[in-house]
């Protein structure tokens, strides 16, 4: 049995078309959705991510604004700029690209973003509201994974789900969303004693640790759904995930590739969150 591929590019295309239609409707009413992206320093990976986010905005009828600062920018100046963006009615979403330079407290910066413009879903108000199932925004990567489950009719209610990774960006919110959908959730991490004992029981495995081959074929229950959130490089410098794709695809029922799986969905859900912020602002105007 070879697993069915969950194609993030195809699903992204569909969702971006819907986002573009919603953006056009808002723009016609004088409320073009606007996203501000703030980049501090010259991290090459961050520059690529920011470029992709700006392009996605431009391609789908969103207004986008990019602030690029040297890594010498002070924390106070960054906080002052966020305050300006919070008060700018043309901006509905604010995204500060992580990581930030060491002298800037990223927690303080993320908390400075107005919760109603926190399209990454990282503000403590949104992270906390996720516990009650009522956040203004859900973090983009796990939100995108949930859309993948939905698009492929993968049953979550009563399913045993294992999330490998406990980051605030993916692991924890992913576990909360699966729990909300009725799954029985286990979170595994670097201190987990016998990872395979957990994953072999799982109907769904989400790997999100940034470590190559953390999940191999012998660790997967036949027919399970495997979601690979990892972004790594193999020995040849080629992009790969956390999952041994070649082996696991022969055992799993569904699997996401890297690249072309979860990655495109993250930016797509950023657009969806931004359009929702703009629609709320327009309704309140």
Curated annotation (Swiss-Prot):
Report the GO molecular function annotations: methenyltetrahydrofolate cyclohydrolase activity; methylenetetrahydrofolate dehydrogenase (NADP+) activity
Subunit and partners: Homodimer.
Disulfide feature = none
What job does the chain carry out?
Catalyzes the oxidation of 5,10-methylenetetrahydrofolate to 5,10-methenyltetrahydrofolate and then the hydrolysis of 5,10-methenyltetrahydrofolate to 10-formyltetrahydrofolate.
Q: Which family does it belong to?
A: Belongs to the tetrahydrofolate dehydrogenase/cyclohydrolase family.
What GO cellular component entries does it have?
cytosol
The record's section on InterPro entries has:
Aminoacid_DH-like_N_sf (IPR046346), NAD(P)-bd_dom_sf (IPR036291), THF_DH/CycHdrlase (IPR000672), THF_DH/CycHdrlase_cat_dom (IPR020630), THF_DH/CycHdrlase_CS (IPR020867), THF_DH/CycHdrlase_NAD-bd_dom (IPR020631)
* Entry EC number(s): 1.5.1.5, 3.5.4.9
Q: What is the organism of origin for this protein?
A: Burkholderia ambifaria (strain ATCC BAA-244 / DSM 16087 / CCUG 44356 / LMG 19182 / AMMD)
Record's protein name: Bifunctional protein FolD
| Record pathway | One-carbon metabolism; tetrahydrofolate interconversion
Keywords from UniProt, A to Z, are:
Amino-acid biosynthesis, Histidine biosynthesis, Hydrolase, Methionine biosynthesis, Multifunctional enzyme, NADP, One-carbon metabolism, Oxidoreductase, Purine biosynthesis
Residues binding NADP(+), per UniProt: 165-167, 190
For this entry, list what GO says about its biological process: L-histidine biosynthetic process; methionine biosynthetic process; purine nucleotide biosynthetic process; tetrahydrofolate interconversion
Which reactions are catalysed by this chain?
A: (6R)-5,10-methylene-5,6,7,8-tetrahydrofolate + NADP(+) = (6R)-5,10-methenyltetrahydrofolate + NADPH; (6R)-5,10-methenyltetrahydrofolate + H2O = (6R)-10-formyltetrahydrofolate + H(+)
Q: Which Pfam families match?
A: THF_DHG_CYH, THF_DHG_CYH_C
């Amino acid at each position: 049995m070879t697993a069915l591929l969950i194609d993030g590019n195809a699903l992204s295309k569909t969702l971006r078309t819907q986002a573009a239609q919603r953006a056009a409707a808002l723009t016609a009413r004088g409320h073009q959705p606007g996203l501000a992206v703030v980049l501090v320093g010259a991290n090459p990976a961050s520059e690529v991510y920011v470029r992709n986010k700006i392009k996605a905005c431009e391609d789908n009828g969103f207004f986008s604004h990019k602030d690029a600062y040297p890594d010498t920018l002070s924390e106070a100046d960054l906080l002052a700029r966020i305050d300006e963006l919070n008060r700018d009615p043309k901006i509905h979403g604010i995204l500060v690209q992580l990581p930030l330079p060491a002298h800037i407290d990223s927690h303080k910066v993320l908390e400075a973003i107005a919760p109603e413009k926190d399209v990454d879903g990282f503000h403590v108000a949104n992270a906390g509201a996720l516990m009650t199932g009522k956040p203004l925004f859900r973090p983009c990567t796990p939100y995108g994974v949930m859309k993948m489950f939905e698009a492929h009719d993968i049953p979550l209610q009563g399913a045993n789900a294992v999330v490998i990774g406990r980051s605030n960006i993916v692991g924890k919110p992913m576990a909360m969303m699966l729990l909300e959908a009725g799954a029985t959730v286990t979170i595994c991490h670097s201190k987990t004693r016998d990872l395979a004992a957990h994953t072999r029981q799982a109907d769904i495995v989400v790997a999100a640790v940034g470590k190559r081959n953390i999940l191999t074929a012998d660790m997967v229950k036949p027919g399970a759904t495997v979601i690979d959130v990892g972004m790594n490089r193999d020995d040849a410098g080629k992009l790969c995930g956390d999952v041994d794709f070649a082996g696991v695809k022969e055992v799993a029922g569904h699997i996401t590739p890297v690249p072309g799986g979860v990655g495109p969905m993250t930016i797509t859900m950023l657009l969806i969150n931004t359009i929702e912020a703009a629609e709320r602002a327009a309704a309140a105007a």
